[in-house]
Amino acid sequence: MFTIDIDTGGTCTDGFFSRDGEFKTVKVLTTPHDLTVCLADCVKEGAKLFDVSVRDMLAATDVIRYSTTIGVNTLITKTGSKIGLIVSKGFKDSLYADDPKEAEPVFSLVPKEMIDEVHEDIDDRGNIITTLEKEDVLDSMQRLIDMGARAIAVSLRNSHVNPAHERKCKSLIKDQYPNYYLGSLRVFLASEISDQPGDFQRTNTIVVNGYIHDALVKYLYKAEDDLRNNFCAHPLMVAHSYGGVARVAKTRAIDTYSSGPALGVIGAGTLGEMYGFSNVITVDIGGTSLDLGLIRDGVHHYDMNPSITGFPVSVPMITTYSAPIASGSIARLDGSNNLKVGPKSAGARPGPVCFNLGGMEPTVTDADVVLGIIDPDYFLGGRINKDRLTMAIDTIDSFAGGFED
């Protein structure tokens, strides 16, 4: 029987296939236009290595697990959904933070003009002080829709002790906008994501979840259907950032945030134990982000209130650290002729110059090929041919000449 583990990043998708103690690895390019394509490509390449058909392999697969850093990359590159946010009256500028300055990073995901307030109040014990009015909710909703919101996040004060007003918002919106609700417009409640105290952290959590939702969830069900259509009898299991896996139906977008690096920490801990190492640093270099993990005395650590690219949230995660520098990061010269690398990444398309998919700007991968750090005869199955190597060298030479100007 087979086990299949696949990780999709912003540039490459990697597969680990095992059968009866034998394992093989695969690397293919991520397909940002449709992530189910690179998932299928990875499975096809894995089947080839075992000299079986895709259907025969999937029919004999006990478990297929999937992890991704797409959520991380979406936040780093600020390419998520346009969302609207509804908060309690008086908290539009602070988002419940003690110091309004703490809320500034959140406005990069949901600008102030996409935030609306409703007049309601629930005290710290869950008692309703001011009742939420229907007209107030629908007026806010309509304004946000008119502003182009593709998803609505609702985070009201003290909803962790009494979510009644948040649930009322969702019910009113569903009744008033059934086509939006069931179709292109989604409604997320902070109380459904977290029941932990801390209105600011819950607000950040629901904003991040709504922001990265479309980049992930829209294709997870399609991926599972594609696998089933090829005789896979078991559900697709999606990796979560706390270290476990769950079915697609039980997965929220924020659960997948940094799930690839998180499971990498668990895997590194297992290898460390096998070789007698109890203190391990893990390094996961992707195409858009670099992620670090730490194992001390054989134990990986959890953060119950982690920070996601500067946003304190209230969902448990294995502790990892992300930086916007990786193999696809683009090098450039600033106004003072200083070398800068990242955070912009070439991704899988147009990709680094050496991929010959339209990329024209030098990346870390191009530099690695020129320096001999990456073997073009091995990387990506040898698809970096001599012509592509020459292109990378010419681009790096041209770029380096800028230092002499």
What is the role of each PLM region?
Residues 1-405:
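N-terminally biased helix-coil "hinge/interface" segments that flank
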